[in-house]
Amino acid sequence: MTQSPTPAVVTVTGAAGSIGYAALFRIAAGAMLGPDTPIRLRLLEIPPAVSAAEGTAMELDDSAFPLLLDVEVHDDPKRGFDGTDVALLIGSRPRSKGMERGDLLAANGQIFTVQGRAINQVAADGVRVLVVGNPANTNALVAANNAPDVPAERFTALTRLDHNRAIAQLARHSGAAVRDISRVTIWGNHSSTQYPDIFHARVGDRSGADIAADREWLTGDFIPTVANRGSAIIEARGTSSAASAANAAIDHVHDWVLGTPEGDWTSVALPSTGAYGVPEGLVSSFPVRSVDGAWQVVEGLEIDDFSRKRIDASVADLESERDAVRGMGFI
């Protein structure tokens, strides 16, 4: 008789929202942690959204997923993160009309301070944290700084959506299949300052540098399309990306736990150790591989002046956000 794998406790904040709704059923089906890992789901919401989260929990029950052992709904972070192995921090304060950037950072600083402290106190020793709620990089920075007993590299922010968007645009432009594109990189912030880099990519039997030689397409089409794709989707749908964001979050954790494909890498925002001139501690996106369940930044990539300028601009954006939340006392 074979021994059953140890169940994974997965906590999803903002579970009643559209990204959470799009992610939860795929997580329960095994898309995130693989077909052999049983799941215990913890749905964490603010009190006004608990009823909606309970409705989602009912639907999860009704789906009778073989891997799903149980579902709990909480509004107390200490209960929601108790023993969690994987935390998807999707819930955040969205920017409302007329809201100043400082107000947005302050509102989210409070949320992610509380969540970081709760994770520090009650999560599993090997917890992995993915921040999806925007401003994701700085929210991850705040959470990590409020969880001093958790290794900083366990706190990451989502740039896999930007990474996937870049691959899709490159496929459309080149005629290559998505599966034949590798080694794309997103640098910097998950914002309009991000830099999607294809200079080291492989596109079928072509190099990304060869395709990037068309600078008019690169600077006038590719980079702005990827960087502003979220706004274009809001304009078209009337609401923000949900299914694609959920898919990217699942991709991110899947590769973190189970490994990146041989010969390829992905993009993850994580605390810098000083690589590529990014200030230490800043949560910035890098090219990474997952090795034995841990992210490792791909080293030794040549960065030309074209790329350096764009990386530096996005890093400056991150430094501005970091300085703002530091001034508010969140880090």
From Swiss-Prot:
UniProt EC number: 1.1.1.37
An MF annotation (GO) of this entry: L-malate dehydrogenase (NAD+) activity
InterPro entries: L-lactate/malate_DH, Lactate/malate_DH_C, Lactate/malate_DH_N, Lactate_DH/Glyco_Ohase_4_C, Malate_DH_AS, Malate_DH_type2, NAD(P)-bd_dom_sf
Active site, renumbered: H190
Class of this enzyme: oxidoreductase
SUPFAM superfamilies referenced in this protein's UniProt entry, alphabetically: LDH C-terminal domain-like (SSF56327), NAD(P)-binding Rossmann-fold domains (SSF51735)
Keyword Oxidoreductase (UniProt): yes
PROSITE patterns linked to this entry: MDH (PS00068)
Disulfide bonds: none
The UniProt record lists the keyword Phosphoprotein: no
Keyword tags: NAD, Oxidoreductase, Tricarboxylic acid cycle
Biological processes per GO annotation: malate metabolic process; tricarboxylic acid cycle
Highest rank taxon of the organism: Bacteria
Residues reported in the UniProt entry to bind substrate: R95, R101, N134, R165
CDD domains associated with the record: MDH_chloroplast-like (cd01338)
Catalysed reaction, written as an equation: (S)-malate + NAD(+) = oxaloacetate + NADH + H(+)
Binding-site residues, NAD(+): G14, A15, A16, G17, S18, I19, G20, N108, Q115, V132, G133, N134
Family: Belongs to the LDH/MDH superfamily. MDH type 2 family.
Stored PANTHER family: MALATE DEHYDROGENASE
Function: Catalyzes the reversible oxidation of malate to oxaloacetate.
HAMAP family to which the protein is assigned, alphabetical: Malate_dehydrog_2
Identification of the protein by name: Malate dehydrogenase
Native source species: Rhodococcus opacus (strain B4)
